[in-house]
Every structure is written in C-alpha cells, then in structure tokens.
C-alpha cells in the first residue's frame, strides 16, 4: 500500500511540475518552438481514451473498473491498470500527458505538445473492425486537421516547425492479423499470407510517407509483439492450453520482417527521414518466457480475466456486465493486466527500452536521440 501511495504521489508531483511548465510554454512562443511534440498513432497498446468518445462496443473500450486502478485511481480508457507506453515516453521527454484527440475541451495550445490519435481495435486496414474503431487512415486525417490548426494558431512558419521537430510514435498492425480469425473469415482461402501482410505493411508505410510529406521527419515504430502467445491466445484451443495460436504466428513474423525492410527503403528514399524501430517482439518475448528476470512472477497469466490463465477477456465485465471475472491481488507480479494488454509496470519497462535502449533492441536511433535532434 505504501509503494502504491508513493507512486501516486510521485506521479501527481510530476503532473503538477509539467503542467506548470506547460502553462509557461503556452504563454511563451520561444518555449513552444524549442520543445519537440509527440504525436501518437495506433491501437489499444497506445489508446489513451479516444474510444470513450465514439459509438462502439464495450469490448473495445476500457472506461470501467478495474482499468486505471493503479495510477489514475479510476478508468481513463487506457487498457491497463495504469499508464501506457506513450505516457512514459512523454514523461521522459518532459512533456505533459499527451491528450486523446477526441477528448473534449482541449485547448488548442495544448496540441503544440502533441496529440494521441490511437484507437483500441484499430488496424492499418480500413476493414479491420470497421465502424467500431478509428482506423489508421482516419487517424492520419485527424492529424492533418491538427496540423492545419497548428499552422493557423501559431503561424505558418511556427506550425511547420512544430511538425518538423515532432516525434511520431506508431503501434499498429496486430488487429489486422487477429481480426479475420475473430470473424471466422475465409479470407486466407482467397489471399496468401504474404500478400495480406504486404497490404498491412504497405498501408503503414504509406501513412509514414504522408506524415513525411506534411513535414514529419522523426518516427518511432514498434514491431508486432508475440501476441500469438498472449494469455488470450493460449486458451483459444481448449484442448491445447498454453499453446500459441499458430495461424497468427506466421503473419506476425512476416510482418516484422517486411516492416523492417520497408523502413530501410524509406530511409534510403526520403531525405532526412529518421526512425527508431523497437523490437517489441523480442522485448515482450523475453519477459513472457523469463518473467522473474524482469521482476514478474507471472509472464503468461493475466491479472484480470477468467478461466485458465485468466485468458478469457471478461476483465471489468468487458463481454457483458453480468459476466464475472477474477482480479489478482498484486498487479506488479504480472506482465499482463488483462489477457492481451500489459500492466503499467511492464509498459514502463518497454518504454525505457524505446527511450534509451541499445541499437540491438531499438535502432538505428532510440527515441531519446530523436527528441534531441534539431
């Protein structure tokens, strides 16, 4: 309990300090000019609450208890017990918490520090959970509106400078590979795995290029983690509990290889394009397979859920308010908070690797280096 209170007090103090700094920045154009913003795109790994404000299902929202229990003491829409990776990246960059794009009453000046466009369930393909989420293409369109607003409010030159100095952080693609199997689709009977992955990665690199054409130069990207072996995946086949969901395994591996090659091509083709690619697959696999090395007791069992490994995603009544779920006693023992999403403790560890990890895990730049670039 004392540790939990200390974390909350420390986070509150950080928030107050950053908020005071933000007020100064709003009043002083020079400080705005010299501070790199953070723009976030992606899915539930990064969604800070955008899905709270769209007409969708409870299964792609997390605005209910016990989500948010650790740091915020109430649900925020983040799919974790506390903070997500972008929250920690913002802290390390001395930025305020990056607000969801759809959150009401955001002052325009706050956008100078960045915006979070991510949406739980989103994919790089428009058809992934269509009508229920904000897909990557729509997230890009929302960014374009913010870019226009910044140029209008700050002036064309200053707005362009905010965009060019900003870091653009992405995690997307996993839902594109899971979605066909949640709908019993016959998709892969009519298209090869490789062609499908080409579509996903192609959509991602197209968005990177469009952000580049708008002035963006610094990109942080996570490859796809081993979610074929997450608690939810380990219980899909009830006759083979703890077996990874093999149909997705090949897609994930192919995705990560093609994403790396795509980024290398962009780096060659686009002058000034710089990127930090985090090997999320490796960093998460290491923690799943050897949790005690990283301070966890459970690497493949969720803190919140039901059934074997708490792998059925009923956390907080996600699949219906009448459905029961179990909640662990000590969330810091767990890598996964719910059957698919990490605890705050795990998110912090991953964020640290993205921020200042060595080149074999985040490269050719890390985010700290990107933020320091003029």
From Swiss-Prot:
Function: Confers resistance to the necrotrophic fungus Alternaria brassicicola. Possesses lipase and antimicrobial activities that directly disrupt fungal spore integrity. Triggers systemic resistance, mostly by the ethylene-dependent pathway.
Chief localization: secreted
CDD domains xrefs: SGNH_plant_lipase_like
Pfam entry (one): Lipase_GDSL
Annotated keywords: Ethylene signaling pathway, Glycoprotein, Hydrolase, Lipid degradation, Lipid metabolism, Plant defense, Secreted, Signal
Keyword flag Calcium: no
GO molecular function: lipase activity
EC main group: hydrolase
EC numbers, comma separated: 3.1.1.-
Gene responsible for this protein: GLIP1
Compartment(s) of residence: Secreted
Residues carrying covalently attached carbohydrate according to the record: 34, 184, 203, 330, 360
GO cellular component, one term: extracellular space
InterPro entries the UniProt entry points to: GDSL, GLIP1-5/GLL25, Lipase_GDSL_AS, SGNH_hydro_sf, SGNH_plant_lipase-like
Family, per entry: Belongs to the 'GDSL' lipolytic enzyme family.
Organism domain of life: Eukaryota
Mutant lacking the gene: phenotype: In the resistant cv. Columbia (glip1-1 and glip1-2), confers susceptibility to A.brassicicola.
Residues at the catalytic site: 44, 338, 341
SUPFAM superfamilies: SGNH hydrolase
Protein name as it appears in the record: GDSL esterase/lipase 1
